[in-house]
Amino acid sequence: MSGTLVLVRHGQSEWNLKNLFTGWRDPDLTELGVEEAKAGGAALAEYGIKFDIAFTSVLVRAQRTCQMVLDAVGQSSLETICDQALNERDYGDLSGLNKDDARAKWGEEQVHIWRRSYDVPPPGGESLRDTGARVWPYYLTEILPRVLAGEKVLVAAHGNSLRSLVMVLDRLTKEQVLNLNLATGVPMVYKLKADSTVASKEVLGDMSAAH
């Protein structure tokens, strides 16, 4: 019997709003981010799911999103595991910089490569491949066994840590994942087969609103 895996990207953060590279820095949600998280929770409540466990990162924007989703589905006290393996991609020396200022310092082409290549990290930071190298093993050892045991599992995390998971779940190429944008607060509901491949996927919201 296979279970259900729900992935949710955190709501808009204060640094998303200011156009800053965030990474492992820890800004809170904006008012819009709170509304996005609540809307994602409301969509899951309407869907009718009840979770067995939740996973999130050690960063407050993901943790608050996770809690708001659980509040919305009536499971405020559900066991939640926080682990830095699910943290956002580490942007290294870019962390805290305005994206326009970074382009002025390093050049638009170089910053674009750091942001959108699969395996070229910014100085002192991680590439998307590096991010996946910590996210995927954690998924395989801690999350997937619960789903395969029939549990309903919530993962509230970040744009790039979730892209690393979606890349494998949806069987995307390196080129395809670079063009993948995940909207804040929009749940993705995966039903998995016994062999851990995807049986079905539903998006509960407008993924075209990604930023």
Curated annotation (Swiss-Prot):
- Look up and give the organism this protein is from: Sinorhizobium fredii (strain NBRC 101917 / NGR234)
Q: Which reaction does it catalyse?
A: (2R)-2-phosphoglycerate = (2R)-3-phosphoglycerate
Active site feature:
10, 88
Q: Which GO terms describe its molecular function?
A: phosphoglycerate mutase activity
Which Gene3D superfamilies does UniProt cross-reference here?
Phosphoglycerate mutase-like
User: Which GO biological process entries does UniProt record here?
Assistant: gluconeogenesis; glycolytic process
**PANTHER family noted in UniProt:** PHOSPHOGLYCERATE MUTASE
Q: How does it assemble?
A: Homodimer.
Site positions (Transition state stabilizer) are 158
Which NCBIfam families does the protein's record reference? pgm_1, PRK01295.1
Q: Which SMART domains match?
A: PGAM (SM00855)
Q: Name one Pfam family in it.
A: His_Phos_1
Record-stated family: Belongs to the phosphoglycerate mutase family. BPG-dependent PGAM subfamily.
The name of this protein is 2,3-bisphosphoglycerate-dependent phosphoglycerate mutase
